[in-house]
């Protein structure tokens, strides 16, 4: 499966989780309290991280692609970071960067260490 990835910085993680959960029609699949949340829909991989000083700014774009080998990142001509990764690679990046997520939307999708 291939999903478009968007990552944003937000001022208030809890308020943003409530807002984006309503907009996406589901709770986040992965949550690291006070720091990070991520939703996976059929076509979208959407994540937010609490960075009040950068609220509303784009962190990166990219693709979650199950056939991706590893985790790659490049910068386009406008200075936007683009990433390509498999679901497993992103899960490992989340754990390494933010910690082990809790409260998945679906128990079978729990990211485990």
Task: Tell what function each PLM region has.
Residues 1-17, 59-61, 94-113:
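N-terminal beta-strand motif that seeds the catalytic metal site of vicinal oxygen chelate
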Residues 46, 55, 88-91:
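Flexible, glycine-rich phosphate/dinucleotide-binding loops
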Residues 25-27, 48-50, 58, 65-68, ...:
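Short, low-complexity, polar/charged sequence segments that are solvent-exposed and flexible
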Residues 16-18, 49, 56, 71, ...:
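Short acidic, gly/pro-rich beta-turn/loop elements at beta-sheet edges
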Residues 3-11, 37-42, 51-113:
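Vicinal oxygen chelate
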Residues 1-2, 7-46:
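Core segments of cupin and vicinal oxygen chelate
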């Amino acid at each position: 499966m291939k999903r478009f990835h968007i990552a944003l910085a937000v001022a208030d993680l809890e308020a943003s989780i409530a807002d984006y959960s309503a907009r996406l029609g589901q709770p986040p699949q992965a949550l690291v309290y006070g720091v990070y949340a991520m939703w996976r829909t059929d076509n979208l991989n959407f994540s937010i991280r609490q960075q009040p000083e950068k609220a509303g700014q784009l962190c990166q774009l990219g693709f979650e692609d199950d056939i991706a080998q590893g985790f790659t990142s490049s910068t386009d001509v406008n200075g936007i970071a683009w990433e390509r990764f498999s679901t497993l690679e992103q899960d490992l990046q989340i754990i390494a960067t933010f910690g082990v997520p809790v409260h998945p939307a679906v128990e079978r999708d729990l990211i485990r260490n």
